Amino acid sequence: MSQGSPGDWAPLDPTPGPPASPNPFVHELHLSRLQRVKFCLLGALLAPIRVLLAFIVLFLLWPFAWLQVAGLSEEQLQEPITGWRKTVCHNGVLGLSRLLFFLLGFLRIRVRGQRASRLQAPVLVAAPHSTFFDPIVLLPCDLPKVVSRAENLSVPVIGALLRFNQAILVSRHDPASRRRVVEEVRRRATSGGKWPQVLFFPEGTCSNKKALLKFKPGAFIAGVPVQPVLIRYPNSLDTTSWAWRGPGVLKVLWLTASQPCSIVDVEFLPVYHPSPEESRDPTLYANNVQRVMAQALGIPATECEFVGSLPVIVVGRLKVALEPQLWELGKVLRKAGLSAGYVDAGAEPGRSRMISQEEFARQLQLSDPQTVAGAFGYFQQDTKGLVDFRDVALALAALDGGRSLEELTRLAFELFAEEQAEGPNRLLYKDGFSTILHLLLGSPHPAATALHAELCQAGSSQGLSLCQFQNFSLHDPLYGKLFSTYLRPPHTSRGTSQTPNASSPGNPTALANGTVQAPKQKGD
């Protein structure tokens, strides 16, 4: 490969962005032999009794939840419930809920700070959100209103509790639902204390407590003061964390119920009053509150989040999928017996060619409908349900173990680079660059576009030459290692593919704690 002149490309700062933070999506629980013996004994004796009694109490909650809303019309439920229903049912649910968590082993809830009134802070924001036990924070908050998925209404008992709570419901299948939720949050938050407080988990999903995920702006759209609420589980062994990669629901429940005693600390921080700029910009407001809470917790505030169904971590100035869908696509196609000989068929460099699912199956010679649908769904579709065959060619080329990294990056450039209006050379513009990074690294398009603009700023054009792109993807001190990790996906027969968090013989580099590191060699 021609390296070009030294002035063609300048590497980015080798230490870009904030210091590396822990990976919040992976929770590893290491038990000693003595701890395993203890959990086996207590898990056989204590856990079944606790879980059984807790489920009995859960079903005892249903009559109180039903009684509070029985006979009320939809119009009446649009206003806060008062009178005897509020007094009897609210106190009944509050007492039984505390008993439920007590039976599961949460013998102590230690409260620090002072909860603000609904006039002082109409909205409460709780973090870190690390487990399905986190609703315990509702108890010292006097059962505030919550935001939940509309689909949960059909879950026995849980649906009744959501109606009792007069929860704000959002539907994943209704595009207009989010707008209505925003309007309802604003209506309640600006009611002058008429409505009880609304509690949000602004991270939106669970992590391992080692870092705060990016806060979603929903809790901050109304622009009213919020009170941050910190949740800590100061136990010697972290059995409660329920992260994307780690112990599942049943194991977390069993391990926690097997503990003799679990403690929860709930701390109310001072009310955060937004500035005029924050009131107008919910994202700025959310980011600033996140930093305040992270500082109080002593953990990093990160940009990590879920994009779709994939966890995304931050490496330098780029967001990448913790485990790219490309690896999952490889497993699907290997099971179907796809040969690498079909990699480049039909792809025209620099020109998009949209294909249907049927043509996709013909090109790859796939016959099983389930395999075809799963593989086709990996690629981004247009409004007509078609995909660009260049995307297919690049993804399959990346899964072909016989290609070098230089060949892969050259192919990526050739497929997506465009002719210049003036000049003989072809350049890789932001759309092609973001498509490549989305396919190979799982990077969201906005993050890739921002990085492209930064790379082009070091040069004199709006696009990248082949030399510049390969210097970035192969030789940059940070991103070069990232490409070498993700373009050498692990080939394993295990049920789950290996995440890039641990070094392996098949991985020249690995992601550790959110940063790219080279594996140690023998004798180091």
Curated annotation (Swiss-Prot):
Membrane topology term: Multi-pass membrane protein
| Glycosylation sites per record | N152
Biased-composition ranges, Polar residues, are 493-518
Distribution of this protein across tissues and organs: Widely expressed with predominant level in brain.
- Record pathway: Lipid metabolism; phospholipid metabolism
Question: Which keywords belong to this entry?
Answer: Acyltransferase, Endoplasmic reticulum, Glycoprotein, Lipid biosynthesis, Lipid metabolism, Membrane, Phospholipid biosynthesis, Phospholipid metabolism, Transferase, Transmembrane, Transmembrane helix
Q: Where are the transmembrane segments?
A: 40-62, 87-107
Show where the record puts the motif HXXXXD motif: 129-134
A single Gene Ontology MF term assigned here is: lysophospholipid acyltransferase activity
Reported function: Displays acyl-CoA-dependent lysophospholipid acyltransferase activity with a subset of lysophospholipids as substrates; converts lysophosphatidylethanolamine to phosphatidylethanolamine, lysophosphatidylcholine to phosphatidycholine, 1-alkenyl-lysophatidylethanolamine to 1-alkenyl-phosphatidylethanolamine, lysophosphatidylglycerol and alkyl-lysophosphatidylcholine to phosphatidylglycerol and alkyl-phosphatidylcholine, respectively. In contrast, has no lysophosphatidylinositol, glycerol-3-phosphate, diacylglycerol or lysophosphatidic acid acyltransferase activity.
Family recorded in the similarity comment: Belongs to the 1-acyl-sn-glycerol-3-phosphate acyltransferase family.
The entry's protein name is: Lysophospholipid acyltransferase LPCAT4
User: What is the species of this protein?
Assistant: Homo sapiens (Human)
